[in-house]
């Protein structure tokens, strides 16, 4: 550890890969199977983590990059990790998840949108940034991998969420 938990903040995608492995050990299931069951329970039928990075994903938006040279090319997916990324979804499924977050009494959903208990850090929760944006309480996070970018910004008091997806 770099510091005592709850005293400092250092973002690391690797932590989510470790968490996925812990879930596998505790449940005895592959992380992709466990998460698929979670999404299916919410009726998010078009959401899953990539299992085979060369596999066909129906209606997938292809990633593009100009590699800094001004000419756009489709970007190959060259890695596959679970926990920190490579989650595919649709706007329909994101809306289902958002409604669940806004209306849920699920303790995990509620805690994920608040600062970590007994922590000196008040601008980060369980995987989510907690800040004021345009004078309003905002809960947000982005995701970036070569050729893709996503951003979700939630204004809970207004029951407003903005999704930005690009490739």
Stretches found by the model and what they are:
Residues 1-146, 150-151:
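Short, surface-exposed loop or secondary-structure junction motifs
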Residues 151-167:
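Short, well-ordered beta-strand elements
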